[in-house]
A protein has these predicted regions:
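Short loop/turn segments that flank or connect secondary-structure elements
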Residues: 1-171
Length: 171
């Protein structure tokens, strides 16, 4: 596995973002036959070369949504009341009606080793990220469109699916 370089990922993503998004839009418009099987196969391959601790871009640039159960579990773990936890770390996003981090990078991310200080009790949104196999591809293209910009594993997955299904290679 070669060392991960976040700066080169961001350059590559900027260069290929529109191509990947167009592919995902085509998938939404006309679902390719066998895409879910291809997705599962390529997901296995992608994770052979990915190390989340080498990146942690999701924790540095995105906020998970916190459910009420997440808030109760995490606040208990850090020795705070749920209300004190919300007041200190979260804000309520009125549009989506979600609890989100007030700051990025995440307050629980150790920026030296990219490890989460609450890993055992982290939000459900974090434990499932990047949500590759959560639902069928067609039901989750909107999530791929968002995550492809932040997550190298999602970028690589969409790139590999595009090549397998359409034979198109990125720059």
């Amino acid at each position: 596995m070669e060392p991960f370089n976040l700066k080169s990922f961001k350059k590559k993503m900027m260069l290929n973002r529109s191509t990947l998004r167009r592919f995902l839009t085509r998938v939404e418009t006309k679902e390719p036959k066998g895409i879910d099987k291809v997705q599962h196969q390529e997901d296995v391959e992608v994770w052979k070369d990915m190390d989340c601790l080498a990146c942690a871009n999701c924790c540095k640039t995105m906020s998970p949504t916190f459910t009420n159960d997440d808030i109760k579990r995490i606040s208990k773990h850090v020795g705070m009341s749920a209300q004190a936890f919300r007041d200190k770390y979260l804000y309520f996003e009125r549009g989506d009606k979600d609890w989100m981090n007030k700051q990025q990078p995440c307050q629980f991310l150790n920026l030296v080793d990219n490890k989460c200080s609450i890993y055992e009790v982290r939000p459900r949104d974090c434990s499932g990220f990047p949500h590759h196999t959560k639902k069928k591809v067609l039901d989750y293209t909107h999530v791929y469109k968002q995550n492809v910009e932040y997550c190298p594993a999602t970028y690589k997955l969409v790139e590999r699916m595009m090549y397998r299904l359409e034979g198109e290679k990125l720059k």
